[in-house]
């Protein structure tokens, strides 16, 4: 999609991105893993275009000395998995499982339904 932000650092700049609509009769909220969708998209881009400059190297949110993707994801795990040509989706499951389980335990007391 194309959009033009009305505030913040990209105000009045034509930007583009991807929007995924997860809906429909077969949609399963408990099974849908949006982080994994974008991780697999990165992996597909890397496989199809191995020389593509996927990781931007400018400072992000005042975090100097780290790649923005590592800041956003809390570490280099996603980037390293994406760049490893031998890494599989099953490896991503192992990489994400501990954090997902910890998050599930933290959020449980706050769920209302």
Where are these regions (language model features)?
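C-terminal regions of mature proteins
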Residues: 79-113
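Conserved functional hotspot residues or short segments at active or partner-binding sites
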Residues: 1-93
């Amino acid at each position: 999609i194309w959009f033009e932000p009305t505030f913040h650092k990209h105000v009045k700049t034509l930007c583009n991105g991807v929007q995924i609509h997860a809906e429909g009769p077969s949609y399963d909220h408990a099974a849908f893993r949006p982080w994994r969708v974008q991780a697999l998209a990165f992996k597909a881009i890397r496989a199809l275009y191995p020389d593509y400059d996927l990781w931007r190297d400018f400072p992000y949110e005042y975090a100097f000395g780290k790649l923005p993707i590592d800041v956003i994801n809390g570490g280099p795990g996603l980037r390293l998995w994406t760049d490893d040509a031998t890494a599989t989706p099953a490896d991503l499951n192992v990489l994400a499982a501990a954090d997902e389980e910890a998050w599930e335990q933290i959020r449980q007391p706050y769920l209302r339904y």
